[in-house]
Amino acid sequence: MAKRSNTTMTSAGLQLGREVAPPDSPETAKLDRVPNPQRDTDYLARFTVPEFTSLCPVTGQPDFAHLVIDYAPGPWLVESKSLKLYLASFRNHGAFHEDCTVAIGKRLTAEIKPKWLRIGGYWYPRGGIPIDVFWQTGRLPKGLWVPDQGVAPYRGRG
C-alpha cells in the first residue's frame, strides 16, 4: 500500500485540530468533508449518537434520541468532529422529531454526496409515546453489507 502524505487528507479550512466555538444553530453549523481514499470500494460507515438532544418547538422541553447514521461513501467522507459539532447544534434548536431526523439525513447527503445513506432516529418517549423516524436516500448498493442498526424497539418496563 502506498504511503499517504498527511497533507493530502487535511485542509486549512477543517475544524479538526482547532479550537472551534459551538455553532449557534444547525443552519450555521459547518460540516467538513475529506476525500474518500477508498472511493472505488463499496463499504459502510456508521455513526452512532446515543445522546442526541433537541428541543420541542412547542413546549421548549428537551427531547432525546439515539441516532444511527449509516452511509456508503462516495467521493467524500464526513469529518467526525464537524459532525459532532453539527449534531450538538440541535441542543438549543426547536424542531419536531421527524424534522430533526430527516433534516440531518438531507444535510449530510447534500454535503458528502454518498452512494447511499440512511438515518434511524429512535426518540425516547414524551407524553408516553416513543417516536422512531427512518429516512434513506434510495436503493442500497448491490452487495453492500449493512448490519441491523441494533436499537431495540422501546419497551419501557414491559
Swiss-Prot record:
It comes from the Bacteria. GO terms for molecular function: preQ1 synthase activity. The active site is at residues 56, 63. Substrate binds at residues 78-80, 97-98. Its EC number is 1.7.1.13. The keyword Signal does not apply. Pathway: tRNA modification; tRNA-queuosine biosynthesis. Keywords: Cytoplasm, NADP, Oxidoreductase, Queuosine biosynthesis. GO terms for biological process: queuosine biosynthetic process; tRNA modification. One of its GO terms (cellular component) is cytoplasm. Residues 27-37 have a biased composition (Basic and acidic residues). It is found in: Cytoplasm. Residues 1-13 have a biased composition (Polar residues). It holds the Pfam family QueF. InterPro entries: GTP-CH-I_C/QueF, NADPH_dep_7-cyano-7-deazaG_red, QueF, QueF_type1. Its main location: cytoplasm. Catalyzes the NADPH-dependent reduction of 7-cyano-7-deazaguanine (preQ0) to 7-aminomethyl-7-deazaguanine (preQ1). Belongs to the GTP cyclohydrolase I family. QueF type 1 subfamily. This is NADPH-dependent 7-cyano-7-deazaguanine reductase. It comes from Bradyrhizobium sp. (strain ORS 278).
